[in-house]
Amino acid sequence: MSHFTDTLNPAQKEAVLNYDKPSLIVAGAGSGKTRVLTSRIAYMIEQGVHPGSILALTFTNKAAREMRERIEQLVPDGRARYIWMGTFHSVFYRILRQEAGRLGFDANFTIYDTANSESLLSTIIKERNLNTDEYKPRDIHSRISLAKNNLVTAEAYAANTSFVAEDRQRKRPEFSAIFLEYARRCKANNAMDFDDLLIYANILFRDFPDALEQYRNRFRYILVDEYQDTNYAQYLIVRRLAQTHSNVCVVGDDAQSIYSFRGAKIENILRFQNDFPEAKVFKLEQNYRSTQNIVNAANSIIAKNDRQIPKHVFSENDEGDRVKVLKAYTDQEEAYLVADLAKREGRENGGRWNEIAVLYRNNSQSRAIEDALRRRDVPYRIYSGHSFYDRKEIKDLVAYFRLIVNPRDNEALRRIINTPARGIGAVTVARVAAVAAERCVSMWEVLEGTGSEQVPELKTAAKKLADFTGLIRSLSLERSTKPLHEFGLEVATRSGLIGSYRMNPSPESENALENINELLSSMQNFKEERIVLAYEEDDGEADAEPTVEEWLQNISLMTDMDKEGEDSKNRVVLMTVHSAKGLEFDTVFIVGVEENLFPLSLIHI
């Protein structure tokens, strides 16, 4: 018997030892699923499974990092470094870079995060002179994302008469045209958004059987965490890869499926045994996290679910306090009720405000809670997913790196062509974009011609545009000659960003300079902190100087949960129920538990 199982309970131990057939591990909340997953992988390696043949897919990069660290503690001889581990997006980004040519992309393609995608959509909507109240970039992006998660491409969407009819009925008849133009521009910009990474992975495996066979043979053992929150695109990737060897292990809990609004399909976990008839089911039913009263309350609610995997979740912890149900007639009354109770709890627990959380279904519900907490002098913070990388100065500097790596990235070019100010106005930028559209080339290709008579429309701005293109070309030549952090400082300096803040001293400028310095420090440490890129088998990649492309991938593939930084401030935490997944607090208030709000009535994006 392996020492990896010494601290496991019987159910956990069984799930670890039986790894050579399809497995469904039903892991209730607080049941130690991470310990089981890491112990299972360590045991597989101990039994002779080559770590390079193991693919472990997680929900967040943070989860992947924590799992890898635990496995390295269990298998300290260095073999764990060869496991392919990360989110679906990070793993298949890595594969798509190798296969980009087959799909019509260059290997240095850019990844558009949500902000980049919404910026591009905003440009398209404005160019089409559409009402931004009817065509909000965020809503349009959400619907595009939902379509892609179900493997519906822009072309397929436009050809679907029911989709088009629904859009007309909902007074957004231009949606399919926006979708088509968005897809066209992403391709022209040599860019993929998050959802494209899954779409193109499926296209690769569908259209290129040799590629599918190659990765089937590489990934003989597949493990998927949080399987209840996978969408159709992710489901199909797993099905395709696991078809030959069938050594697939999925871990999840149908009772914790909370991302259907993002395209997650609870059917994926419910039909696993139909997909893999030889599958063995392991149930982790002991909750180590919660008191028995909380477990009982959760069980009584879950029992009402129409479709579920039968299980009996229990706790051997103390009974604990009973769940209290409090009534209020208005949201203001509810907010002050919570604020008063939170203030009392904070005083009684010695001022540990960060052990108190207020959960709600929608972000809009936080306003009343914030007002009440402020009036009661209770310190709080909003856990929103907004991050260091959302700050203007950071987005500006990152856009320079994006353009240097991928000159076809029009969105990056638009952001920095006059940042800091270099006398290139909005009219000139619009002319560049118009010429690019007319010639079916990127904006960068237009700029490269401004030094001659090729672009007469831009003759008056030719000198300024040539200076800008010269700067980018020069920096591009230097990126392979310097260590990453030194190159970062070079870009921040020669771009004029650092100088622009130093020339206008203010608290805001000082803060911006501190943030830029922090970003440069993160680049310096990146070699030791490669938390996204898995190690290539035996090629020494881990010891090589990291590239700008690798660093950009690291920050581009962060999920909202990964971006939410550690906050040492001692404050009550306000967050949506979705953000709270996997977190622990001593005291939790759930507000707005009322009809059509929690649970939310079905809405259409």
Model-derived features: where do they sit?
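Conserved helicase NTPase motor core
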Residues: 6-17, 21-25, 36, 55, ...
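Conserved phosphate/pyrophosphate-binding and hydrolysis machinery centered on Walker-type P-loop NTPases
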Residues: 9, 57, 85, 110-114, ...
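Short glycine-/polar-rich loops that comprise or flank the Walker A/P-loop
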Residues: 21, 49-53, 80-81, 244-247, ...
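Helicase P-loop NTPase motor core
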Residues: 29-37, 51, 100, 277-280, ...
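Short alpha-helix plus adjacent loop in nuclease-associated cores
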Residues: 91-99, 255-262, 289-290, 383-405, ...
